[in-house]
Amino acid sequence: MAFTVKDILSIQVAPALGCTEPAAVALCAAAAASLLPEKASIEALEVRVDPNIFKNGLAVLIPGTEGLSGLDMAAALGAIGGNPAKSLEVLGEVNPEHVKQAQALIKDGKIRLNLLADHKGLFIKVIVNAGENMAEAVVESMHDNITRMALDGVPVEKSSLIAPKESSKNARAAELESWLKGLGLKHLMDLLDDLDDEDLAFLEEGLDANMKLADYGLKHGPGLGVGKTLDRLMRQRLIARDMILDARILASAAADARMAGVNLPAMSSAGSGNHGLTAILPIKAVHKYLESDHESMLRAIGLSHIVTAFVKAFTGRLSAVCGCSVAAGAGATAGVTYLMGGNANHIADAIKNLMEDLAGIICDGAKSGCAFKLSTAAGTAVQAALFALQGVKVMETDGIIGASLEKTTQNLGALSTEGMIETDRTILKIMLEKQFSPD
């Protein structure tokens, strides 16, 4: 089965409010709670998650909560005030009263979080008990993919929240990833020829959303304030302004805002809001230094999303490797190289340069420190493109770099899915020890 660029954007790119993992848990809880009688009083709520959902949802702040975090809070908010029809923007209507009620549930010990330590792949199950009723929902494979809902043990057969099995987003995403793995870079680039006005408008929407996050981060300096600090250092003339620095500033400022729980949506890429920031914002930063037109920038962003999806097909949706660095970073450097007039060879060289530079960066969960990693990924994406256009490219004799971009990406996928299994377990072990240590 072949896919179009419109299919890729539809499956891989979507708005998300707050970090994607807590949003997915909130969505699952909201879907389950929607089956209960109106105004039912929640007596118990159980959340079961795979290790990577647990890792990425442990420390990141939740929008609309004035600095609260945790998957238990996300689930409670989703069940109390979430709107499952809004998918990953499920918490967009949460208010202070909902937060107060969620805190009470947690304080009273009514929320239980269980880690499914041996589960492979993205998985969330929420069970809500209220009076004589028990409702449940399951999200799996993709953050917004609700595969099951049931009330009192009876599966819900018809719901607008559950896609028909024959056309489920999960199945389409799996087919897309399998299809992408068989493509070369030239084919990926050819997909851009099919971008229409509707697609360009959607790409513009994503750019606008992510720029709002960057602008907020620059103005207010939430979280660690990495973007605002870089901007201040530049204004103090302690570091020099160039396109690399501007890319770092935009990406990190947006990450500062998003990881601090600012109530603004991000346009995600490959299921991750931070991937979306990395895939889009460096291209915007570079554009103002060039004479290229606005549509060319949007097409470069389109290529970035395509390449990000291509790399993620090999590395997996969640792993011990920082996808913002190697997947969205690859997308960004492809887009930047394209915008600068590079050909397929230049783009392949740029991506290989970036992978050689960033392949070792681990994912130790979503949190404020991700702003540093997005800063690094964005700056390296621009630098890798500039190097490639100057004829600098990593040789195939070096480490995991292969003779082609496709082989290099396969090698990176093997590193991510096979080589980093124990790394992921160790990261999670350290995080769990911190979370439950009496110190």
UniProtKB/Swiss-Prot annotation:
InterPro entries: Ser_deHydtase-like_asu, UPF0597. GO terms for biological process: L-cysteine catabolic process to pyruvate. It comes from the Bacteria. GO terms for molecular function: L-cysteine desulfhydrase activity. Belongs to the UPF0597 family. This is UPF0597 protein Dalk_4447. It comes from Desulfatibacillum aliphaticivorans.
